Amino acid sequence: MSFSSDVRNELARIIPEKECCRKAELAALLAISGDLVVGEDGRRILKVQADNAATARKIITLLKENYQIPSTFKALEQKRFKRKRIYEVNVLLDGEDEALNKELEEILLLREKETTPVLNRSLLGRTCCKRAYLRGIFLSRGSINRPEGEYHLELVLNDSRMALAVQKMLDKFALEPGLVERKNYLVVYLKESEKIVDFLRVVEASRALLNFENVRIIKSVRNNVNRQVNCETANLSKTIDASLRQIELIKRLLEEQGLEILPGNLRDLAEMRMSYTDASLKELGDLLDPPLSKSGVAYRMRKLEESVKEILQED
């Protein structure tokens, strides 16, 4: 099962306690995934599709808790896409209860001859309702990469008004989403791991958030270890190259002039380098008498190399 499916299954099981939040989330689910059709008897039916059974069951639950509206539920085979099955909830909008019909129309802002519901912004006055609405948006049109891979979360919308509204709403939570057009859709997306974590916190996907954070921490530690190893490897390579260069110079001096030509402090360092070819500068400094700091050894080693080069050039 994908990480997106895990998140959706978790969100599908969250039923808001407040009626205002239930209405906001239901309105998002109906507005994003719903299409209006006219039945044979002339009455309007709202067909809402979901890509998993848990989301479909949530739509039915919210309809029942808010409006006591009966709805039908069925599974459909969808062969054109990778997922083999989708779920459809059918809601009769022109029932016998006129007051209920009117309330549904107001929530969805249904207009004559329109086939797509539009969200009523008056439902989003409170922060808790915005959270519920974004939860409904993700359930309908959201996806998120596994935290082990590249960080990416997106909400795919087919209505420009809805996309801009979602982008502004995410901005209210300081998530700073991007917006890009992809074929016939508008995609609101997040690519920073911190922003994705914040989004999961906003929609109250606590279990997914914990899993995401655990993987993110492990990745961060692993990356830090890799950087440290690479840095140490590079430093070791530099140390080996410098040691080989120094030993080669000292060998040439031994063959052509001898070490006695060097000043005492440089001669001691040259002899120490030849005796301990694998030692680092710090280790050489500890072996000298009196001991010398790493920076002191580095300075003296540069003087040694310069002196040897001058002597060999004069010869």
Swiss-Prot record:
Keyword annotations from UniProtKB, A to Z: Cell cycle, Cell division, DNA-binding
Single Gene Ontology MF annotation: DNA binding
Hydrolase keyword on record: no
Record-annotated DNA-binding residue ranges: 280-313
BP-aspect Gene Ontology terms: cell division; regulation of sporulation
Chain ranges passing through the membrane: none
Keyword Ribosomal protein part of the UniProt annotation: no
InterPro entries, per database record: Homing_endonucl, Sporu_reg_WhiA_N_dom, Sporulation_regulator_WhiA, Sporulation_regulator_WhiA_C, WhiA_LAGLIDADG_dom
The family this protein is said to belong to: Belongs to the WhiA family.
Purpose of the protein: Involved in cell division and chromosome segregation.
HAMAP family, sorted: HTH_type_WhiA
PANTHER family to which the protein is assigned, alphabetical: CELL DIVISION PROTEIN WHIA-RELATED (PTHR37307:SF1)
Protein name: Probable cell division protein WhiA
Protein species of origin: Syntrophomonas wolfei subsp. wolfei (strain DSM 2245B / Goettingen)
Gene that produces this protein: whiA
